[in-house]
């Protein structure tokens, strides 16, 4: 019976583990027992200091690969022994199938890919520090954010008066 399982991998090795499982299936002629292998990802926008943007792919569940497989002890041990595979998720060192609700949530999250999100998120009311431009080293409060244009509308307090400014994401940093 085909069930979904979660495999824990070394973080950052999800794609190489997926490829290794695909190769294992092809080499041992067990493709009919492995129905699907997924590494859920999302697109993010990374903005460099020079305001150059690039879309990058980021794992939604770092360190995990999900597999729909007809699993027996032999196949479990073959997958378990692949490089960069830590373990199957389960109880008492035995793999436990994921519930329909869990895998449904994962697949829904994966299929509802929206426009790429910025790597750094700002929220209304959040206090940030301006790191570039005429207001460098000032702290400001986020009033609005424009994801599409990667701009923020901030309120900066200058000489006791609140002044609205518009600034690029790359010109501010979060205060931790």
UniProtKB/Swiss-Prot annotation:
Task performed by this protein: Participates in transcription elongation, termination and antitermination.
Name the PANTHER family for this protein. Answer: RHO-INTERACTING TRANSCRIPTION TERMINATION FACTOR NUSG (PTHR30265), TRANSCRIPTION TERMINATION_ANTITERMINATION PROTEIN NUSG (PTHR30265:SF2)
Gene (name only): nusG
Alphabetized, the UniProt keywords read: Transcription, Transcription antitermination, Transcription regulation, Transcription termination
What SUPFAM superfamilies has UniProt attached to this entry?
Answer: N-utilization substance G protein NusG, N-terminal domain (SSF82679), Translation proteins SH3-like domain (SSF50104)
What are the TM regions of this chain, as residue ranges? none
Spell out the family assignment given in the record's similarity comment.
Answer: Belongs to the NusG family.
Q: Does the keyword Lipid biosynthesis apply?
A: no
GO cellular component: a single term: cytosol
At the top level, the lineage of the source is Bacteria
The record's listing under HAMAP family reads: NusG
Q: Which Pfam families match?
A: NusG
Matches recorded under InterPro entries? KOW, NGN, NGN-like_dom, NGN_dom_sf, NusG-like, Rib_uL2_dom2, Transcrpt_antiterm_NusG, Transcrpt_antiterm_NusG_bac_CS
What protein am I looking at? Transcription termination/antitermination protein NusG
What does the record list as GO biological process?
Answer: DNA-templated transcription termination; regulation of DNA-templated transcription elongation; transcription antitermination; transcription elongation-coupled chromatin remodeling
* Start and end residues of each KOW domain: 125-149
The stretch of residues making up the signal peptide is: none
């Amino acid at each position: 019976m085909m069930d979904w399982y979660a495999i824990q991998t070394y973080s950052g090795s999800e794609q190489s583990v997926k490829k290794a499982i695909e190769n294992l299936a092809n080499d041992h002629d067990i493709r009919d027992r492995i129905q699907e292998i997924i590494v859920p990802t999302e697109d993010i926008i990374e903005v460099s200091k020079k305001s150059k943007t690039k879309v990058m792919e980021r794992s939604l569940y770092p360190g995990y690969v999900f597999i729909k497989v007809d699993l027996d002890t032999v196949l479990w041990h073959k997958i378990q022994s692949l490089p960069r595979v830590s373990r199957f998720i389960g109880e008492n060192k035995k793999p436990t199938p994921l519930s329909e609700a869990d895998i449904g949530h994962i697949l829904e999250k994966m299929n509802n890919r929206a426009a790429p999100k910025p790597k750094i998120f700002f929220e209304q009311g959040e206090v940030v520090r301006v790191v570039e431009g005429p207001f460098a080293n000032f702290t400001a409060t986020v009033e609005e954010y424009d994801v599409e244009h990667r701009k923020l509308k901030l309120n900066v307090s200058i000489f006791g008066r609140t002044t609205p400014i518009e600034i690029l994401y790359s010109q501010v940093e979060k205060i931790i």
